[in-house]
């Protein structure tokens, strides 16, 4: 007999929801929705999970995100790319806790004509990169080619053991390569 508790149902739905961008990415398939239907039948409280994921913030998180969007967000003038470098000092200044940057990389995709967003975060041990895109733009290929990363078509990550400024420079230098690859592949 299967044992399914509310905690298990909630954890499964949370993973599905966050991995699919709230079911907005093309990685959401019919089977995903069938699984969610099963979770609903097992007692999933979808509204409770959504509130916990998307509508609960602490003040320091909001200030960190506000600082990044106001002072760090750069939109490339030649290519539809937004870049957000975030220093370790900024994380410390705003009392960063795991999860405080969750979803931030997606926000620049709402800017008109931006189809790729790259968040570059300086951690104590290395620099972490998060890539997001709209449509058929394979950011996983860019992450794999230059940033020791990978992922999916519209969501990828990478990491580098270099100073933040060097990683930002490398991202900017490889933007033309990435868009040339897109052009050559017919996307």
Segments the model singles out, each with a brief description of its role:
Residues 1-15:
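A short, charged helix-loop
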Residues 13, 18-187:
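Hydrophobic helix-and-loop "lid/oligomerization" segment in the mid-to-C-terminal part
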């Amino acid at each position: 007999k299967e044992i399914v508790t509310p905690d298990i149902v909630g954890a499964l739905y949370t993973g599905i929801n966050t991995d699919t961008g709230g079911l907005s990415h093309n990685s959401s398939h019919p089977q995903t929705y069938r699984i969610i239907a099963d979770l609903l039948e097992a007692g999933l409280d979808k509204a409770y999970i959504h509130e916990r994921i998307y509508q609960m913030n602490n003040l320091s998180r909001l200030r960190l995100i506000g600082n990044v969007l106001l002072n760090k967000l750069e939109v490339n003038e030649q290519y539809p790319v937004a870049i957000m470098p975030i220093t370790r000092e900024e994380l410390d200044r705003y009392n960063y806790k795991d999860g405080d940057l969750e979803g931030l990389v997606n926000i620049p995709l709402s800017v008109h004509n931006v189809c790729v967003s790259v968040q570059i975060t300086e951690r104590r041990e290395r620099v972490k990169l998060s890539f997001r895109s709209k449509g058929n733009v394979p950011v996983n290929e860019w992450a794999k080619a230059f940033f020791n990363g990978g992922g999916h078509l519209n969501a990828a990550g990478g990491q580098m053991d270099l100073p933040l400024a060097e990683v930002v420079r490398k991202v900017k230098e490889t933007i033309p390569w990435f868009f040339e690859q897109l052009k050559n592949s017919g996307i």
